[in-house]
């Protein structure tokens, strides 16, 4: 499970910013939203992030995606490849300060695998790894597994499978160790592979969509989700069809992207085809047959739910971690509430975690849905640096955290307005 992420000098985050999923001890808050790990660590299963306009909240999710790709894929880089060659990664430092724009990006992440707490630290620029450290804790005492400064790597208590010499200045040692067969590194590698970051310009790959046909339980899940959204689709099917590359939507844009990565342009590609079956009625209101509609005939909202459904299903089924940017762009409030409550349940979807950004005010009722430590805010300071806070950091009275009072306290929080005295305890 994910515990903490620290970001420093990355995109809009100038100073060290910690996104923590550690639960704050409060007897008044419900316990169903947390899981207890070793060493007396209670971890939240869900977290909601609100933002003020132009606060760059998406950069928080980009940092997660960057850490994931670096760990899972940096072994692919040749000795002279820049780090941003990995999936168009952005490794820009904070550029609105003369000092930070010349300094490396820094990440720290704490997570749990099989009751072991790991802490991983990373510092890098666009061409090289500056430092890299890995620690673990099974009991109360933390031990160092390996440390790295530039190309000097010291192994303390870690099986690198004799692959230390294969680490170039632009490869993460952890990524190389996993590729070369280190069992502990492979376990950590799998953990990061199972973190999903969902942006709305993303859609499932053909391989993921092919998996849908292999899982009989996904189809009822998807139908249930669509029908809860009042779409009343009777049936769904999916197939792959080979079509000429130039017939793809936005083929010229795709072509330019492939050419920028020195990837050959294929003559034909496999495109996924969804059919949605809606009932056809006779004059007496009886269903007489079903008509198949292409997914292109469905609404934009239906297509968004379709894209998101696979990620939600996969995370629930395999106990993974899901970050979603602007979840309210797809899900109706009732669906969103149902999803949050499902993830919050301790005995259901046991080790799943979901973190999302939203401006949906219908989930603000803490007594029924959220703890105060599950609600976060991203704002920007006068120097245009993003800051992250959570509601439990201040003494706002619990009864004020409702949709009715949203516009009072959200603007107090972000703009420090005159409502402050009304919302704070005496």
What do these predicted regions represent?
Residues 117-252:
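Electropositive, glycine-dotted interaction segments
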């Amino acid at each position: 499970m994910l515990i903490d992420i620290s970001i420093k000098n990355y995109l809009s985050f100038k100073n060290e910013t910690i996104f923590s999923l550690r639960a704050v001890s409060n007897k008044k808050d419900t316990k169903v939203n947390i899981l207890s790990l070793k060493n007396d660590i209670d971890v939240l299963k869900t977290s909601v992030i609100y933002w003020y306009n132009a606060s760059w909240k998406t950069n928080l999710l980009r940092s997660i995606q960057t850490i994931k790709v670096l760990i899972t894929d940096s072994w692919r880089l040749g000795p002279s490849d820049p780090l941003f060659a990995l999936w168009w990664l952005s490794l820009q430092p904070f550029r609105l300060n003369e000092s930070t724009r010349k300094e490396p990006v820094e990440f720290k992440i704490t997570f749990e695998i099989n009751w072991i707490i790991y802490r991983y630290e990373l510092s890098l620029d666009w061409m090289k790894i500056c430092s890299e450290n890995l620690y673990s804790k099974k009991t109360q005492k933390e031990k160092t597994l390996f440390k790295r400064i530039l190309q000097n790597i010291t192994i303390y208590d870690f099986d690198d499978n004799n692959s230390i010499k294969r680490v170039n200045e632009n490869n993460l040692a952890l990524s190389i160790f996993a590729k070369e067969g280190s069992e502990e590194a492979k376990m950590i590698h799998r953990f990061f592979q199972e973190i999903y970051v969902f942006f709305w310009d993303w859609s499932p790959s053909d391989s993921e969509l092919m998996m849908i046909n292999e899982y009989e339980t996904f189809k009822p899940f998807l139908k249930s989700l669509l029908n809860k959204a009042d779409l009343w689709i009777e049936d769904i099917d999916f197939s792959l069809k080979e079509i000429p590359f130039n017939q793809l939507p936005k083929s010229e844009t795709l072509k330019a992207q492939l050419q920028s990565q020195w990837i050959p342009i294929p003559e034909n590609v496999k495109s996924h085809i969804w059919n949605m079956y809606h009932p056809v009625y006779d004059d007496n209101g009886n269903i007489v047959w079903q008509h198949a509609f292409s997914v292109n005939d469905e609404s934009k909202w239906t297509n968004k739910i379709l894209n998101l459904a696979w990620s939600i299903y996969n995370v629930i089924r395999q106990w993974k971690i899901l970050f979603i940017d602007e979840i309210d762009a797809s899900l109706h409030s009732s669906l969103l509430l149902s999803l949050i409550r499902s993830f919050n349940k301790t005995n259901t979807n046991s080790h799943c975690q979901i973190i999302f950004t939203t401006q949906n005010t219908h989930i603000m009722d803490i007594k029924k849905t959220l703890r105060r430590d599950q609600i976060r805010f991203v704002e920007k300071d006068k120097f245009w640096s993003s800051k992250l806070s959570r509601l439990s950091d201040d003494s706002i009275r619990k009864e004020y955290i409702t949709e009715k009072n949203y516009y009072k306290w959200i603007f107090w929080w972000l703009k420090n307005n005159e409502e402050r005295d009304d919302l704070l305890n005496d």
